[in-house]
């Protein structure tokens, strides 16, 4: 298992524990994997099971796009596995965006 995956798994478990214990449903989290990618993530617990969001036909891509907004957002946290998958997707999307920006900057210069 790669170091980044282990980091995300541990972060997901800690994040879920904090959401369940804290009176305030908002948890801010800074991800800093070994590859140098840093990402600030803010979770707001809604106490709504993920299955309800799926029943309402909320696509995963919409949830991910909302997560990338700088404003507060909502996400249902029902398992550390779901949080881990979400954080992994966020980091991958951020890396892709940075790669495209670097390539675009090289082409225009």
Curated annotation (Swiss-Prot):
InterPro entries membership: BAGE-like
Localization of this protein: Secreted
Keywords linked to the UniProt accession: Secreted, Signal
Primary localization class, coarse: secreted
One GO CC term, this protein: extracellular region
Entry keyword annotation includes Secreted: yes
Keyword Chloroplast (UniProt): no
Entry comment describing in which tissues the protein is expressed: Not expressed in normal tissues except in testis. Expressed in 22% of melanomas, in bladder and lung carcinomas.
Family annotation (Pfam families): BAGE
Superkingdom: Eukaryota
Signal sequence coordinates: 1-17
Family (UniProt): Belongs to the BAGE family.
Further facts: The ancestral BAGE gene was generated by juxtacentromeric reshuffling of the KMT2C/MLL3 gene. The BAGE family was expanded by juxtacentromeric movement and/or acrocentric exchanges. BAGE family is composed of expressed genes that map to the juxtacentromeric regions of chromosomes 13 and 21 and of unexpressed gene fragments that scattered in the juxtacentromeric regions of several chromosomes, including chromosomes 9, 13, 18 and 21.
Function of the molecule: Unknown. Candidate gene encoding tumor antigens.
The name this protein goes by in its record: B melanoma antigen 2
Designated gene of the protein: BAGE2
């Amino acid at each position: 298992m790669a170091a980044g995956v282990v980091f995300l798994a541990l972060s997901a478990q800690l994040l879920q524990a904090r959401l369940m214990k804290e009176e305030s449903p908002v948890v801010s989290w800074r991800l800093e994997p070994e590859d140098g990618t840093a990402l600030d993530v803010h979770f707001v617990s809604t106490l709504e099971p993920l299955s309800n969001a799926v029943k309402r036909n909320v696509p995963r891509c919409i949830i991910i796009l909302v997560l990338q907004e700088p404003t507060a957002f909502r996400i249902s946290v029902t398992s550390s596995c779901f949080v881990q998958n979400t954080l992994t997707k966020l980091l991958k999307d951020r890396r892709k965006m940075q790669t495209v920006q670097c390539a675009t900057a090289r082409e225009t210069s």
